[in-house]
Every structure is written in C-alpha cells, then in structure tokens.
Amino acid sequence: MAKSAQGRKKEPTPMMRQYLEVKERYPEYVLLFRVGDFYETFLDDAVTVSAALNIVLTKRSNGSAGEIPLAGFPHHASEGYIAKLVTKGFKVAVCDQVEDPALAKGIVKREITDIVTPGITYSDKILDDRHNNYLCAVALFKRGREHLAGVAFVDVTTAEFRMTELPVAELKDFLQSLHPSEILISSRDKELRDSLAKSMNTLFTVLDEWMFSAEQASQVLENHFKTHSLKGFGIDGVEGGRIAAGAILQYLEEAKQGSLKYLVRIGLVESAETMTLDIQTRRNLEIISSMQDGSLNGSLLEVIDRTKNPMGARLLRRWLLHPLRKLEAVVQRHDAVEELLESDSMREESRQLLGGIIDLERALARIATSRAMPREVRLLGSSFALIPQLKAMLASCEAQRLRHLADRLDSLPELAETIERALDPEASGTLRDGGYIRAGYHEELDELRAISSGARDRLLEIQQAERSKTSISTLKVQYNKVFGYYIEVSRANSDKVPEYYEKKQTLVNAERYTIPALKEYEEKILTAEEKSQFLEHRLFQELCAAVAAEAASIQKTAAALAELDCLACFASCADEYRYCRPAMNEGTELSITGGRHPVLERILGADEPYVANDCRVGSDQQLLIITGPNMAGKSSYLRQAGLVVLLAQVGSFVPAESAEIGLVDRIFTRVGASDNLTSGESTFLVEMNEAASILNNATERSLLLLDEIGRGTSTFDGMSIAWSMCEFIHDRLRARTLFATHYHELAELESRFERIVNFNATVVETADTVIFLRKIVRGASDNSYGIEVAKMAGMPPEVIERAREILAGMERREVEVPTQREAPPRVVSQQISLFEEEESRLRKALSGIDINRLTPLDAMMELKRLQDIALGKSKA
C-alpha cells in the first residue's frame, strides 16, 4: 500500500544532495555552486550573500523537501562579487562543473576548484599593490619554563615566506606590525584567538590540532622543498616557527591553490639585524598611518613614498617598520643613496625604467598558479628587456650596495625571447577569446587556423555550387550553435530541392537542410577549431611552466629591483626636500642641527615655513626636560627627533642641516593616551602599562620620547611618578631621553643630576594673547599658558576669568620637592578645597580676633594681616 503524502520522507533533489555533500566538507565557507552560467548559493549562505552583496534573495524548489532560499550571480561577474565577499571577511569556496553538461550522465560532476580567503587571494580587486597580503600561523609551545610562540607568514602573491620565534608577551606587538589578513591557530589555542581578536581586526581560522605537530611540519616542509633536511634554510633549530610554517603549507594545499613550487625559499626574521618598533611607537610617530583617522594621509610613508614600482612600495613599507641596527648595513644604504643623489641622470633613468617594469612578484605568483592572462605573461617578457640597461648602470657604480644589486639582476634572455616569439601583442589578451599565440610560433597551430580561416571561402564555394545545381538563387549556407552548418531554402523554392538534401528543420517561411559535403566540412572545421583552442591553451600552459621554472631567478631579480626603487626613492626625497646625509657611528650621541619634522614641513608648505630646531642628547646631557605650553611644539619636537633617527637607520637621508647619530637599538614613545575599553583599561592604566614596558625594555642605546608622563592621575601622583621615572632613566638606563612635561617642578632635576638639562618651548606674550615661536631653547619655562590656550580655543569669558582666579589661588600654594632622591614629593591624598590651607589659616586668624576690643586703627592693621595671609605673604 502506497504511503500518504504526509508520511513520505522529504527528499532533496539530486543536485541539492550534491550541494549538501560539498557544503558538509566546507561548513565555514560561503559555497558558490556553479549551475549553468550562474554561481548559486543556497540556504543560510544565500541569506548571507544576499545581505553582503545587496542582491535579490529568492527561492528554489527542492523536490519534496519544499522551497529553499537562493541567491546567485552570473559566472562572468564572479571576480567582483567574490572580492566583495572576501573584503567583508568571508571565506569563499568555488565549486565548478568539471564535465560538459551535454555529455553528463545524470547530475553534472562538480568539484571545489578554488578557495579564496582574505589571506589567500590573487585578485587585483582585493589586493592593494603597495601592501603585502600576509597569511600567518601561530603555534604556542614551551621551552623549559618559557612560554613561546612560533610564527610563520607568507604572502602567496609575492612568495615571501618567513618565520620566527618570540615570547608570547611580544606576540601581539609582532602581529600588529605584520598586519596579516588571516591568522591560522590550532584548535587547542582558541583562548589565544579570543585574546588577540580583542585588539586585531583580522580573520582567525582554527585548524585541527594535528596540523600543528612538529613531526607533521617537518615532513610537509621537506616534501615541499624537496630536501631531506631544513638545515640549508637556517631554520632547523626554530621548532615553533617550523610548526607554524608547516600549518601554512597544509592549509594552502587543502585550499586548492595549484602548484606552490614558486615558493622556493623560506627564511628567518632576523631580529638582531633590525629594530623592533612597538605599536605605540608606530602609532605615535605616524609611520604608516596617521593618528587622526588611520589613513595614509599625514603619515611618514605618504611623504617619502616616491617609489615607481609596487615591489618597491611594499619593500619601503617593510623597511620603515624594521629599521636597521647594524652600522655597516646603514652606511651601505647611505653610500648608495648618495651616489644616486649626485648623479641626476642615473637616478632619473633608473626610476623611469623601474616604472616600466611589471610587478614581477605578483605576476610570477599568478603565472605559477595558472591564474595569469596572456597579457600579463607578455608584460613580464617586455620587463625582462629593460633589465640589461639597469644592470649595466649599476655595475659601473662605486657604491658597493648598487654593484651588489647589479649582480642579482637576471634578464633571462632565452625566456624573454621565447615569450616574445610566442605571444601576439595585438591579441585581446584573454584565454577565452584565443588568438594570443603568434602566427609562425607553432606549425600545427598554423595549419589548424588555416582550416578555420579558410572556412568562409569554402562555404561560399559550396553555396555557389548548390545554387548552380538547384537553380535556387536565394539558397544560403549558414550556421548556428544548435544545428551547426545548414542550407536554408525558402518555402517557395522547396519543390526544387534535390533528393540528396537531408531536412534538419522546418520554419514558417523556410526549410533547413544538410548535404554530405557540408557535413564533412562541418566536422573538419569544428574539429580544427576545437583542436586549435586546445593546442593554443596547451602552448600557453607550457610557456607559463617555463616562467615558473625560473621562479628563483625572477624572485631574486624582483628583490633587487625593489631595493633599487627604495634607494632611488630616498635619493629623490633628499633632492626635493633638502635632506642631508647623517653621520652614523657606534656611539651614544644624537646631535641634530636644524632638524625638521618631515611630515609637518610638507603639510605647512611655503606659506608657513617649518621652524627648524637643534637637538643634542648624549653622554653629557642625556635627559632633556622640555617644558612649555601646549601648542608650542613640544610633542612635534619629540616626534621630529624620533623620525630623524628612524629615517637615518632605514637608510634615508634626513630633514636637517646636519646630523650625527649613534646607532639606536629601539625607539620608545609615550605620547598621548586613550582608554582601552575592550581590555577594561583606563587612560592612566594604559599610560602606566606603556611606561612600564619602556622602563623594562629600554637599554643605554635606546631613544626614549616621553610626553606628559603622569597626567592621567592627580597632580601630585603624576608629578611623583614623572620625577621617579627621570631618576630611574638617569641612574639606571642612561638612555637618550626627551621628556616633555607640564610639571615645571621637574626643572629642579637639572640642579640635582649631572646629565639632566632643561629646555623650553618659547613664547612671546602680548597684551591680550601669546605667540608660539615653536623654538626649543635652553632653560626651563615657568608658565604653561593653559588659560591663554583656552581663550584662543573660544572658551566663554566668564570661564576664563574664573580660571585666572583659581590659578592665582593655587599658585600661592607651595609644593615641596625632595631634597634627596630618597624623599619624593609629598603626596596629598585628599583635596577638600582648592584653598584648604589658606582657609585654615584665615579661620585661625579670624577666630583669634576680639572684635569688641578693636579700635579703628587696630581693625585696619588686622585687615592688612588677613590680606597678607590670603596672598601667601604671612604664615599667620
């Protein structure tokens, strides 16, 4: 007996069963399912995609299982839609039809052909050609009692692949400087993900724990690099980094990324060679983004990035975040910049050539993974043709670094010549359109094309012959995709059709036929076209394989070109901005004459010339206490010193008349503060955390830039902390320090410590305002001019007047400062009233007066005494 409709099991359609099977394997991905000319999404994915892409959400029948949500888009527009999804943080799995639907028996076979995530993408619609796009992995482990993190990162678009190990406490800072688009973490380390996610707007992907095993990692790395040992890469002893690198390779292989053979090397992050810049320093110095809105505008990078090639732009960004610490390396860059600066013709010619070279790194990655179009390969070949000129110029240079770059350049003449012979520069440049292989490159392809191109003439011959045989002058030989080639005869002439005509289709006003000769030629034409397309594609794949086989040489050449671009960029900046070559040494002196802030001077322009300042800090004046009002230039002075040092150790010339710089191992900054609400930290706690990190990590070779330490708490607490920090820096760290403060009491330190010196930001007072000269000069300031600044800001007059009254009262109070280091300023735990002490004295004086016995003269005398008490002239 048949089951009722209600009791029958609800079954999805065969295609939906296929979809659900694939989706089960990729639950965390938006699954794009190819159906004819569309990519469709179903169920929850459809709802997600509809909202993310702002496309229509509709429904589709799912057999007895009812209707399901559906959203989709045309396959030819897929790149743009996928880019939008990935930019919004989604991971996308592309499931394509892998057999001809016309030949399929049952459901068309489908497979995952590509995976696109924020960390795995080659699309120009997603990538910024001036930024690296890093995929990172983190592996936590212990060595003895020490908790460490192994970190590996790769940019699949440039083949940069490196690793390191570091204490877990330094992990967040390292990752924030790297700014990866995606971070891989073991399922056992989900707490780490939750912790990092609070401060990083990055996609975290959790992988199975087995993918982070040491044994698995070694096997994966050795298989990939085709070696029995990793010692040759210098990473054999970096177990945590190897584990992370192994996880990355496994993730890429599972992500259907095609051949990864172009990832030909892996290296270590050489922490001893470069300076570490923590997040506070990167932010406060506005190295790659401004503090105002996080954009490039107003940053150091915006000012000095005059690179001509995306490879150079990406390297410049990395250089700025990792200044050099080795004197020889810094001097070599300065030598190269100086030679490029002195030779205008060589500098400009090299920059022009660099501008004509394609992004070799990203082109190679797309070619090696079968994602490139013929046009990109052709541009690669034409780029090789420019390299001999650059190589010849650099080989004749005196600077050792420039000659070294010449040695690393390889124009690959044989490959370039093959590309030139193979690809037609006049072709459309897409694989779909064909015609991109030059005529004369391959004999068989030429023959097949001849058959196809001669088809029209042959068809006209058949048409003319049949018109003669049948006496039907309107007879036509035509073609469509459904019926192929056919002969069309009008209904009026159908009685003249010979018996050997085989009917194919009947229309309202015509009949369509075929004949043996037409069938034979149709098969020949279609076979030739099919063979031609297949052969052309095969030849292109062979050409791409030849390019990929030279991956190591191309990457080495690309790295040399990027470095040349950066050095020429520095020379161009030095020429245009009047930068000088700094004298570098191993000492601990910092002496800048006529120093300028590289960003502010560009913003101000010619209408308001930037006020240059000298800065000398070292063995005899190690700690500069800088006082003065807001808006007078103290913070800019601090940042200016930091940026001059950073530029020098990156290899650039610097904005100054002259500069002598003893190498710095770290630059620390504490400028401004804000609440860290996500971590439950107040402004003052954030400030103290940053200050503690500086005191615990700085050395004698560090540069400390400290602004308004202690302002996040009460006056006396803050001043005590600032005072104590100055003592600690002077006595223990002995680091070069610029210390800007509103605590004028700190000026006392100069008389008590041999290497502490006072400076101040000068102002000129007029009758009703103050003028900030933005000049830093010797000596202490005795006024912060805060009320004048408030007045300039437009505070109501009554607020300004009341502030003056309160200030006058507060200035009559004396703050005791320690006479010895062991006796810090006395801390007042409570402040009942602004004039608590004055009120107490006045109360005592008033209570002791016997009004009934006062003569008029006595009353006048008592009034004078009370006035003196109020003005602080008497202690009562």
Swiss-Prot record:
GO biological process: mismatch repair
UniProt KW keywords: ATP-binding, DNA damage, DNA repair, DNA-binding, Nucleotide-binding
Pfam families membership: MutS_I, MutS_II, MutS_III, MutS_IV, MutS_V
GO molecular function: ATP binding; ATP-dependent DNA damage sensor activity; damaged DNA binding; mismatched DNA binding
Gene Ontology annotations for the cellular component aspect, listed alphabetically: cytosol
SUPFAM superfamilies with a match to the protein in the record: DNA repair protein MutS, domain I (SSF55271), DNA repair protein MutS, domain II (SSF53150), DNA repair protein MutS, domain III (SSF48334), P-loop containing nucleoside triphosphate hydrolases (SSF52540)
PANTHER family: DNA MISMATCH REPAIR PROTEIN MSH1, MITOCHONDRIAL (PTHR11361:SF34), DNA MISMATCH REPAIR PROTEIN MUTS FAMILY MEMBER (PTHR11361)
HAMAP family per the UniProt record, alphabetical: MutS (MF_00096)
Protein name, as recorded: DNA mismatch repair protein MutS
Lineage: Bacteria, Pseudomonadati, Chlorobiota, Chlorobiia, Chlorobiales
The gene coding this protein: mutS
